[in-house]
């Protein structure tokens, strides 16, 4: 078939014979894919040839890492799988960080990589890399296609695997000759995946055990993770917490799963969590974890974590239950379905009046804080508060990793699900800007703010060109402290102020750099300038880069030092 010949899904089923590349395009249409993030190259040219005039929207980043992080942002906000294409060799290996990020944060991606022709696989051919071997630890599943007829079945399976159970990335490696050879197309394959049957319905006996545990607990607390968001269970979590009057703490990735202004909300738990959330986890007698995996950044020293508590762990991934914490009440199932079942049980509320009194006292005595002294420079915490104020709390906030990420989590109270896009488990610098692009493409009318540091921003700043090309109204707010802030903080506290390679001796002019990309750039150095310029920038429908000079020696508090328990926080008060 020639380059410009169009074959829609109906005619494809009728004619049956087509190239592997066209099978890929038609399969994506069957899966109702609307958007692809990709970067062409030699091994995927047959695919890009069939993509031409296919009707599918393709986003061309300026680096493959930008493609996969944008796909992550798209998946996180839309709930749909992000689709990525990259060529063989370096194109494929440039995706590894994004795959690892999506794997640990449970984001559904379907990633297509080109490969050298089957006849030269294993010969160190030009741009050959064993991408299956390289990515096996960081993908939920992976395939290498050897016959074009297998492509529709494999793609159908890949979307199913990526989006069911615990979501994750699936990689499909396509040799160039497989993309050009013709074969019979059919998308009517029955799904047959022996050994892959995710459990969504909970065991009734375990539900009863949990109901009984709640009725007898004096100090219950819920730890809600990203599994609540992946399961679209925010409303059920709120209803269950209110029904049983159980306070709720969140992991970093779980923010937005429970309204931050709710009386039962304790805040974020963990290394930079609130005093109340951390002490609640330390002192509770029943801990109900929902869609959280007891990451070390949440638990602190395990010897001290929830030391007197019975642990109930609700998770769709049975491999997570008992992996870190000994669990007395394991519940395998989808968070939404499990919570619906718990609500139906309408168990007896525990007598936790003294517990609630204690939590209220902690909230009153130990709020999040910072010293608002502008002689030390414009405080980044105040900047985040202004962003919240000027966006009315309705923005989608995408961040990089570091101090600015923690301040965003602490001082931008999220009321709704799917407004918070960040790299949690892997902690990937350079994530924020491309993820914001993906989020904006998923929600075209939303206000999307990329909050980044001056370090991480420079890892993927070339994606500004995508923002300009598509005229996306992304707002990029750079917390510019002229250093790697979190690294500098650790060096100050734990390494006797030996600031080894954490301060930037020189930097580009970010305003001029933005203007070179055709994007408006503004600079803010004080609270007065923030009041004057920030609201207009954040409420416009044009892309803007905002370079904010913030206090360089500001630290993120509270903080749990490595090896310490959650109750051993430092910096809980000025």
Swiss-Prot record:
Mg(2+) binds at residues 454, 481. The gene is ilvB. Keywords: Amino-acid biosynthesis, Branched-chain amino acid biosynthesis, FAD, Flavoprotein, Magnesium, Metal-binding, Thiamine pyrophosphate, Transferase. GO terms for cellular component: acetolactate synthase complex. This is Acetolactate synthase large subunit. Binds 1 Mg(2+) ion per subunit. Dimer of large and small chains. Contains 1 molecule of FAD per monomer. The role of this cofactor is not clear considering that the reaction does not involve redox chemistry. The keyword Isomerase does not apply. Belongs to the TPP enzyme family. Pathway: Amino-acid biosynthesis; L-isoleucine biosynthesis; L-isoleucine from 2-oxobutanoate: step 1/4; Amino-acid biosynthesis; L-valine biosynthesis; L-valine from pyruvate: step 1/4. GO terms for molecular function: acetolactate synthase activity; flavin adenine dinucleotide binding; magnesium ion binding; thiamine pyrophosphate binding. FAD binds at residues 166, 272-293, 315-334. It comes from the Bacteria. One of its GO terms (biological process) is isoleucine biosynthetic process. It catalyses: 2 pyruvate + H(+) = (2S)-2-acetolactate + CO2. Thiamine diphosphate binds at residue 64. Transmembrane segments: none annotated. Gene3D superfamilies: 3.40.50.970, TPP-binding domain. It comes from Bacillus subtilis (strain 168).
């Amino acid at each position: 078939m020639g380059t410009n010949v169009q074959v829609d899904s109906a005619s494809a089923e009728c004619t049956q014979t087509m190239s592997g590349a066209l099978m890929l395009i038609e399969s994506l249409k069957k899966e109702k894919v609307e958007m692809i993030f990709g970067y062409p190259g030699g091994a995927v040219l047959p695919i890009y040839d069939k993509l031409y005039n296919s009707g599918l929207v393709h986003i061309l980043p300026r680096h493959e890492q930008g493609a996969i992080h944008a796909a992550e942002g798209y998946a996180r906000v839309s709930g749909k799988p992000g689709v990525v294409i990259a060529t063989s060799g370096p194109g494929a290996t440039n995706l590894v960080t994004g795959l690892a990020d999506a794997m640990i944060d449970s984001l559904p991606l379907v990633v297509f990589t080109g490969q050298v022709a089957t006849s030269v696989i294993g010969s160190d051919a030009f741009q050959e890399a064993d991408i299956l071997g390289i990515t096996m630890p960081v993908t939920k599943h992976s395939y290498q296609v050897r016959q074009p007829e297998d492509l529709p079945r494999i793609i159908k399976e890949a979307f199913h695997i990526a989006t069911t159970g615990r979501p994750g990335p699936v990689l499909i490696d396509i040799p160039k000759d497989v993309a050009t050879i013709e074969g019979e197309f059919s998308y009517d394959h029955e799904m047959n995946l022996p050994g892959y049957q995710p459990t969504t319905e909970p065991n009734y006996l375990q539900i009863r055990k949990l109901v009984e545990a709640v009725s007898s607990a004096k100090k219950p607390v819920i730890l809600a993770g990203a599994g609540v968001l992946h399961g679209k269970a925010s409303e059920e979590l709120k209803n269950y917490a209110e029904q049983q009057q159980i306070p709720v703490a969140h992991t970093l990735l779980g923010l937005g799963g429970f309204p931050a202004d709710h009386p039962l909300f304790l805040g974020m738990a963990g290394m930079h969590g609130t005093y109340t959330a951390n002490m609640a986890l330390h002192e509770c007698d029943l801990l109900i974890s929902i869609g959280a995996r007891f990451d070390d950044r949440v638990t602190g020293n395990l010897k001290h974590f929830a030391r007197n508590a019975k642990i109930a762990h609700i998770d769709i991934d049975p491999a997570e239950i008992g992996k870190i914490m000994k669990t007395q009440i394991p519940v395998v199932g989808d968070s939404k379905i499990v919570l619906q079942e718990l609500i139906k049980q309408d168990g007896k509320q525990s007598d936790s009046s003294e517990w609630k009194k204690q939590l209220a006292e902690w909230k009153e005595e130990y709020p999040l804080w910072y010293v608002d002294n502008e002689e030390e420079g414009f405080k980044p915490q105040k900047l985040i508060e202004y962003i919240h104020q000027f966006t009315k709390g309705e923005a989608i906030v995408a961040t990089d990793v570091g101090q600015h990420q923690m301040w965003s989590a602490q001082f931008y109270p999220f009321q709704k699900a799917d407004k918070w896009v960040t790299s949690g488990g892997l902690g990937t610098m350079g994530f924020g800007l491309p993820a914001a692009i993906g989020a904006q493409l998923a929600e075209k009318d939303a206000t999307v703010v990329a909050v980044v540091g001056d370090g991480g921003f420079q890892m993927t700043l070339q994606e500004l060109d995508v923002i300009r090309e598509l005229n996306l109204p992304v707002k990029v707010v750079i917390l510019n402290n002229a250093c790697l802030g979190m690294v500098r903080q650790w060096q100050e506290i734990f390494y006797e102020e030996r600031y080894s390679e954490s301060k930037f001796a020189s930097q580009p002019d970010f305003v001029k750099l933005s203007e070179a990309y055709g994007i408006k750039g503004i600079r803010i150095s004080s609270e007065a300038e923030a009041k004057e310029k920030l609201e207009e920038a954040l409420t416009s429908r044009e892309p803007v880069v905002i370079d904010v000079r913030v206090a360089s020696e500001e630290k993120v508090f509270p903080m749990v030092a490595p090896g310490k328990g959650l109750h051993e926080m430092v910096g809980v008060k000025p």
